[in-house]
């Protein structure tokens, strides 16, 4: 295994659980930092990539932003490549801020405002409300509105136990609207 030149490690449940480092993994990374190219992958879109850099740094891992892989990157490429300019997000404030930062030309509708949405973008929403669900479900009843999801994880690991994640929300929307996302950007999807 040590003859590999690059490792891509998941974060939640592999490098840490919540704010608790998984010490064996951290020790392995630090022991081989100078000889192996480490990158870190997370489907968890409820936190900005800079949050992951800061968390890893606090654990002693000298990570930089270019080593963090997130489904937001291919999502933005898809939005740009398909000329989607207005989205209704089902995601928390950090996710919305990340969309606005990475694609300033994107019109990210405020919650409760759904007029003009070209796509519903579903992420891991730690601030989910019934109002968000209602607006998204009504939008998804229109086949002209694209349905995109950042990742299919059913649960997110936490120290308290598994928590509902975007895949669980996808099941909710499928039950309510009959639709599944046209594109899913996080692992294990392409």
Where on the chain are the PLM-derived regions?
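HAD-like aspartate-dependent phosphatase fold
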Residues: 1-11, 15-190
């Amino acid at each position: 295994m040590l003859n590999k030149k690059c490792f891509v490690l998941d974060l939640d449940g592999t490098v840490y659980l919540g704010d608790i480092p998984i010490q064996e993994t951290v020790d392995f990374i630090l022991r081989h930092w100078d000889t192996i190219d480490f990158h870190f992958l997370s489907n968890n879109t409820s936190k900005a990539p800079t949050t992951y850099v800061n968390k890893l740094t606090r654990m002693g891992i000298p990570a930089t932003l270019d080593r963090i892989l997130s489904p937001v990157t291919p999502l933005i490429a898809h939005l740009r490549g398909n000329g989607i300019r207005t989205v209704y997000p089902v995601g928390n404030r950090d996710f919305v801020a990340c969309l606005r930062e990475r694609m300033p030309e994107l019109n990210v509708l405020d919650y409760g405002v759904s007029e003009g949405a070209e796509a519903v973008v579903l992420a891991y929403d730690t601030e989910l409300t019934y109002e968000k669900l209602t607006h998204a479900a009504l939008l998804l009843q229109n086949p002209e509105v694209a349905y995109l999801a950042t990742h299919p994880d059913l649960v997110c690991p936490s120290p308290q136990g598994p928590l509902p994640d975007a895949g669980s929300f996808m099941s909710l929307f499928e039950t309510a609207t009959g639709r599944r996302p046209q594109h899913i950007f996080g692992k294990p999807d392409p």
